[in-house]
């Protein structure tokens, strides 16, 4: 396992973008996962944020997160397409080769599997000219897709070369999804793995998962699922995953 494939996420740090970049470099990491908020919220503007990232010398693992894209229609869908285009352009400017898209939580979104696949197929096609991959993640409180086997089914149905999965240990443990389901996934279609833990054994409702994710998520080794995190990483390594971790 190559330690250069590990890098932190800016949403885990306080302070300015420049301070986060400096801290990551000082800790010996070579890459960083960026939040769009770090870029658009920079006090000197988006171009200054992009320049700071480039000057840091850190490789950008990916950009997060496109929310509530799939399953909408009409003006809502058109709006989300515009948001996706803007985020893809931001990825391109930052040198990020992966855009993280999480499963929809919108009450307006349909759960029709065919439409979900069509929408993600469209998103992947938008990313092709910029040579960006889409990593689709099952949020544990997603409205229709909340476990990674469901996300994998949608990705398979969409059948685009640049559309794959993001696997997040928090969401997997929050829904108590068995790791055995990883055996059904093609390791080449896993584009990103995110590692974190939380402070208790289970979360019993979507609301509980949201609260836990926002206020009680901790680094691997600091929560109550340390053995499961290690098992998760070993399983990924065993199935041939050689991509990035954040």
Pin down the residues of each PLM region.
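Short, contiguous strand/loop micro-motifs
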Residues: 6-8, 35-37, 73-75, 109-111, ...
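N-terminal pre-domain/capping segments
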Residues: 1-97, 128, 164, 190, ...
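A short, acidic, amphipathic alpha-helical segment used as a generic capping/interface helix at domain edges
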Residues: 223-238
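Short acidic/histidine-rich active-site segments
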Residues: 244-246
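Short, hinge-like loop/turn segments at secondary-structure boundaries
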Residues: 24-25, 49-52, 78-81, 117, ...
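Active-site acidic/histidine proton-transfer and metal-coordination neighborhood
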Residues: 18, 70-165, 174, 242
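Acidic/histidine-rich catalytic cores of soluble enzymes
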Residues: 32, 63, 122-222, 226
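Short, conserved clusters of charged catalytic residues that mark active-site
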Residues: 16-19, 44, 118, 149, ...
């Amino acid at each position: 396992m190559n330690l250069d494939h590990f890098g932190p996420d800016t949403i885990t740090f306080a302070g300015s973008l420049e301070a986060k970049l400096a801290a990551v470099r000082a800790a010996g990491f070579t890459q960083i996962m960026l939040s769009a908020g770090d870029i658009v919220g920079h006090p000197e503007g988006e171009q200054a944020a992009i320049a700071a990232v480039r000057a840091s010398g850190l490789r950008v693992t990916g950009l997060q997160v496109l929310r509530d894209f799939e399953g909408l229609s009409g003006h809502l869908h058109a709006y989300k397409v515009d948001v996706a285009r803007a985020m893809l352009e931001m990825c391109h400017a930052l040198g990020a080769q992966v855009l993280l898209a999480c499963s929809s939580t919108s009450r307006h979104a349909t759960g029709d599997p065919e439409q979900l696949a069509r929408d993600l197929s469209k998103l992947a096609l938008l990313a092709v000219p910029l040579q960006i991959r889409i990593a689709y993640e099952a949020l544990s409180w997603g409205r229709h897709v909340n476990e990674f086997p469901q996300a994998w089914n949608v990705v398979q149905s969409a059948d685009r070369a640049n559309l794959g999965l993001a696997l997040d240990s928090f969401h997997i443990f929050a829904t108590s999804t068995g790791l055995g389901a990883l055996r059904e996934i093609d390791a080449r279609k896993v584009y990103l793995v995110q590692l974190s833990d939380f402070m208790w054994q289970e979360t019993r409702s979507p609301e509980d998962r949201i609260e836990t994710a926002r206020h009680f998520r901790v680094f691997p080794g600091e929560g109550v699922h340390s053995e499961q995190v290690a098992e998760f990483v070993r399983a990924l390594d065993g199935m041939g995953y050689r991509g990035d971790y954040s």
